[in-house]
């Protein structure tokens, strides 16, 4: 199970955001130093430890603020909600609350890149059988939020479960079997059978 951590940086100010630290603190710090980046925020797409294990250590090393959805049970300096904007330099990162995998799941839209955490993967979607999971909330998150975005949006998931590490919304809409048009009831039945 490969976890992905991402660094989003403004080229002019060198301010950066880390999306999902995972257990990669040393690697993240090295990349930030090598690229002369100032990590301003650590954003967790959800509270599961495989995405948040390094939050406190990275925050201590960089003085970055930890950001998570207000429903998240992890330590956070900044609580966010759907529609909030986190800004680094000229880059605006829009918070999209996407519950389903967990109550606190969020996706982050930065320009045409969507960091999906465990909400949507290449060719798959997040599990709903863990505490806080909800098939109806995942349906709404996928079909009423994510699928309303522009087709050229790049999907950058929290894990490498697919045939490739990233995709586009247009490709996923056409090829991801989870995203085939279904009613909420059909989706619930489909998810319970997989």
Language model regions located:
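Histidine-centered catalytic micro-motifs
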Residues: 42-52, 96-103, 155-162
């Amino acid at each position: 199970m490969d976890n992905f951590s991402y660094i989003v940086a403004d080229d002019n100010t060198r301010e950066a955001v880390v999306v999902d630290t995972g257990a990669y603190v040393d690697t993240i710090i090295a990349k930030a130093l090598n690229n002369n980046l100032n990590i301003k925020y650590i954003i967790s797409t959800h509270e599961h430890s495989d995405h948040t294990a390094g939050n406190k250590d990275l925050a201590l090393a960089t003085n970055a603020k930890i950001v998570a959805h207000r429903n998240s049970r992890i330590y956070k300096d900044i609580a966010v909600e759907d529609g909030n904007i986190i800004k680094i330099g000229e880059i605006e990162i829009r918070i999209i609350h996407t519950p389903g995998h967990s109550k606190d799941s969020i996706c982050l839209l930065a320009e045409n890149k969507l960091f999906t955490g465990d909400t949507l993967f290449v060719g798959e979607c997040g599990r709903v059988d863990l505490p806080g999971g909800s098939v109806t909330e995942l349906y709404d998150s996928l079909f009423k939020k994510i699928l309303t975005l522009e087709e050229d949006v790049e999907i950058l998931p929290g894990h490498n479960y697919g045939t490739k590490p990233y995709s586009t919304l247009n490709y996923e809409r056409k090829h991801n079997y989870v995203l085939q048009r279904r009613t909420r009831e059909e989706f619930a039945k489909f998810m319970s059978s997989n």
